[in-house]
Amino acid sequence: MRHRKSGVKLGRTGSHRKAMFQNMTNSLFEHELIKTTLPKAKELRRVAEPLITLAKEDSVANRRLAFSRMRNKNMVGKLFGTLAPRYQARPGGYIRIIKCGNRDGDNAPMAYVELVDRD
């Protein structure tokens, strides 16, 4: 039974899903705007927002924890150096999802995922 199991499988194995969201998180933090399918966008919010909350308190332990989840030293630096100070006063809701129609070919619902207050 799947009682109380949160998260969406998205038709992938656990390792594939973990790697995909790791890559999507790095892309989101690098470009601050990405386009993806709506279910992936909604699940990405559950992965990326806690990292920004974690980065608001800068410590070696938090940097190591963020690195263990992102595996990209440059993006960890940007997360703690640029993004966390930007959202210091905001108590959550760092990511905005904007629907942008359906994809040609398979008619999948698409969405833009962007960081709020980006320049």
From Swiss-Prot:
GO molecular function: structural constituent of ribosome
Entry GO terms, CC: cytosolic large ribosomal subunit
Pfam families xref list: Ribosomal_L17 (PF01196)
Keywords, alphabetical: Ribonucleoprotein, Ribosomal protein
Gene3D superfamilies registered for this protein in UniProt: Ribosomal protein L17
Quaternary assembly: Part of the 50S ribosomal subunit. Contacts protein L32.
Any one of the GO BP annotations: translation
Keyword Ribosomal protein attached: yes
Species of the source: Psychrobacter sp. (strain PRwf-1)
Gene that specifies this protein: rplQ
Family: Belongs to the bacterial ribosomal protein bL17 family.
Protein name: Large ribosomal subunit protein bL17
